[in-house]
Amino acid sequence: MSAEPKETTASVRMSVAEKSSVEERAKSLGYKSLSDYLRALAASDMKAVSPTLIQPRITRPVSRYHETNLGTMWNGDSLDWMDSREAESVNLIMTSPPFGLVRKKSYGNEDAHAYCDWFRPFAEGFKKILKDDGSLVIDIGGAWKAGTPTRSLYHYELLLMLCNEYGFHLALEHFWWNPAKLPTPAEWVNVRRVRPKDAVNCVWWLSKTPFPKASNRRVLAPYSDSMKSLLKNGYQAKTRPSGHVISEKFGKDNGGSVPPNLLAIANTESNGTYQDYCRKRGLDIHPARFPSALPEYFIRMTTDPGDFVFDPFGGSCVTGAVSEALGRHWACVEMNSAYLEGAMSRFEGDPIVLAKDKPSSYTIFTPCAAQVMENAVPLVADGGAARPKK
């Protein structure tokens, strides 16, 4: 506080109980007097309502790292790339930004508390470059609060921010289930046994208008055996107990079934071409690569051949490689040149394998199907607050 003498006095009317409460609060915060506390409150309030001068960004050049017939890998900051990009010139932004993990990793995670503030400049850029009928797809993993078996809400706060502040529409939330994911977090899953394993990422499919161009006919899954039998033997139209009317059209062969928004895609590329390429050259392996089938799904469903796909957090350039294989123009921007050096493996030798060339299905068993005697397995009464004794 200022050491200058205070020549002006003022009266503040409050009850005895209110005065006592305020004085107690001021004392607990270390203020020597009630006056000092009230002046500090006023200064804080004035600072909160004062406009903050936002310094304009100085656009820096991004360097062209590698170019193909259809796309380019860029080394630099994607904010700079978007600053110089023509407005409404991108059909799909497909990306997996650094997750706001509580335990920061080597690839540049922001503290989850500040994640939305960190993301805002990117949201501005996305809104600028995306076409009105385009899509923004964000694969984003969850985070655990440090020291507790409870979840951060940062990825939901990000979704709300993009919709409420920037006017994006949630076309449909998707959930990427990785059947090969290890039981994590180990402390709560394997040690204290108070949570099931976290094996799903949220994937937000957003758009500038409620009606982005799309077709689910582009991403059909094979029919199940029961549906194949129904198509072969016919189906009698009827009303189900739920009240839904199943018409004769239900028995029409449409070439495949419409997939759900639960995407079962194993991420099992631990010993693939990309890793071998990086290991032989002593390069950093990007720690958060999504499988090629994930961008393939959205690229097929929301873009046409010749459209433009952009990944602002390019990493090992999976999005670019899939876009190239599907005949889309593309750009991937990555700040770490070592990751781009490893990404070269995706454009040398054999092209990336698409989903149609490696069809697969996964079985997930019904929870509670394994026989367990409840009397022999007591609940963890303290909710996992203490580690079990060995």
Give names to the regions the model predicted:
Residues L53-R57, R217-P222, V353-I364:
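Short, flexible loop/turn segments with low-complexity composition
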Residues M1-K27:
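Short Lys/Arg-rich basic patches
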Residues S21, S28-I54:
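Short, basic amphipathic alpha-helical segments that act as recognition/interaction helices
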Residues E4-K6, L38, V194-D198:
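A generic structural micro-feature
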Residues N75-D80, S360-A369:
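Conserved SAM/SAH-binding loop
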Residues L340, M344-L354:
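C-terminal helical cap(s) of enzyme catalytic domains, especially alpha/beta-barrels
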Residues I58-G342, L379-K390:
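Core catalytic lobe of class I
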